[in-house]
């Protein structure tokens, strides 16, 4: 590729974590200091359109200064939310509120690469049944966090990392009972 005149511009990172980790002492201290002001809750599917707009607002704000970021439009985010709703189990989208204002969120999805790897791109005649079984009954052992964000005004404060930790912690509490062993965050 480099012989064709292309050169690397930016290295992008992915993080892996085991969901059975213990909270670091610093997070425990921050929780004791600020926890009363923070509420973490799951996405309300009964108000999906409003909730998706909250997530979009947080995401666009949180990522606005990142390299290569292009903000989601309302239509794009609404469509993505509708498309992903069949993959999202209850509790897999967590929203953190600070003093009643939504300021952080996390979306955890099954790792579709694990789920569809042996289907060879074929849903017919029985691939669709295997896919459904693996998503609803025999849950995958790996998950992905494709979307996460903390509002920019909080990112360089002590509460910012706490908010990120709390939505991750709420998400991991949902995946541990499912037998998930690894979560990729990228």
Predicted ranges, named:
Residues 137-140, 151-165, 178:
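Conserved glycine-rich acetyl-CoA-binding loop
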């Amino acid at each position: 590729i480099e012989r064709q005149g292309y050169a690397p511009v930016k290295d992008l990172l992915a993080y892996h974590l085991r969901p059975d980790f213990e909270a670091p002492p610093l997070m425990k201290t921050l929780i004791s200091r600020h926890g009363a002001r923070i509420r973490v809750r799951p996405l309300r599917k009964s108000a999906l359109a409003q909730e998706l707009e909250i997530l979009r607002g947080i995401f666009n704000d949180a990522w606005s200064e990142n390299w290569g970021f292009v903000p989601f439009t309302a239509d794009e985010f609404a469509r993505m939310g509708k498309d992903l709703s069949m993959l999202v189990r209850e509790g897999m989208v967590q929203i953190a509120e600070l003093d009643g204002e939504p300021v952080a969120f996390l979306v955890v999805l099954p790792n579709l690469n694990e789920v569809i790897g042996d289907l060879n791109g074929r849903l017919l005649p029985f691939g669709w049944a295997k896919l459904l079984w693996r998503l609803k009954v025999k849950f995958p052992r790996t998950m992905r966090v494709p979307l996460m964000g903390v509002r920019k005004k909080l990112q360089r404060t002590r509460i910012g990392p706490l908010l990120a930790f709390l939505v991750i912690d709420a998400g991991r509490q949902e995946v541990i009972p499912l037998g998930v062993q690894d979560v990729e965050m990228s």
